[in-house]
Amino acid sequence: MELISIPALSDNYIWLLCDENRHVVIVDPAESQPVLDTLESRGWIPDAILLTHHHHDHVGGVPGIIDRFPELLVYGPAETQSKGATIIVCGGDSINFGHFSFQIIDVPGHTLGHIAFYQAPYLFCGDTLFSGGCGRLFEGTAEQMYTSIGKIAELPDDTLICCAHEYTISNMKFAHAVLPNQTISEYQQKVIRMRENNQPTIPTTLQTEKKINIFLKCDDIDLQRNIGITPNSQPLSAVFHQLRRQKDQF
């Protein structure tokens, strides 16, 4: 498999995944031209588009890509039907063609219908889990998002987290403010250097995220204390909610 990230808009990543038989999927195309240019440069013809949720910066490129490849299948949750999805999928479904076998995982929170696509080791999780952070709660509840992130945390440690935004520096700045330790500090400096060299910090691995992503550390006593919660006095979803609120105001 070959994985390509295409920078788009101000901080988006569009993903292309190509299997050994040159079957290609496009994930969350924010805009069309960068995708069309990349496909042309490699001589690839896409088979499908995968949409994680309905926000414009994840679906804006669908019409332009469909104009060029009108036979494309477009998979997405029900909330993306008006954005171009032709095959509606939800948690528990699977998508199989070529060497692809994607499992669909329901991950509501950022939006109510948000889904993720998983084919080991790749997880295309849209705006659910970022490196060092997680998505805002635009439609869902903190409890939903906490449960969704928990589903991701149960995947193998070598899972590649292919999220849709380059937010890592700002996420790590907040993480260091909340839970200043050597591991987080070192990773913060690492991603700063990467971005200074115009390198993407994505994909990351689930193993890395378990070490540096404070939204996966809601059971940490020091973290709870540092965000104003008496240790072990609240459900972990409430700790997550408080952490997300503080990130929104950071």
UniProtKB/Swiss-Prot annotation:
InterPro entries in UniProt: Clx_II_MBL, Glyoxalase_II_hydrolase, HAGH_C, Hydroxyacylglutathione_Hdrlase, Metallo-B-lactamas, RibonucZ/Hydroxyglut_hydro
Cofactor binding annotation: Binds 2 Zn(2+) ions per subunit.
A Pfam entry, by short name: Lactamase_B
Keywords, in A-Z order: Hydrolase, Metal-binding, Zinc
Binding annotation for Zn(2+) 1: H53, H55, H110, D127
Bilayer-crossing regions: none
NCBIfam families xref list: GSH_gloB
Name the record gives this protein: Hydroxyacylglutathione hydrolase
Organism: Photorhabdus laumondii subsp. laumondii (strain DSM 15139 / CIP 105565 / TT01) (Photorhabdus luminescens subsp. laumondii)
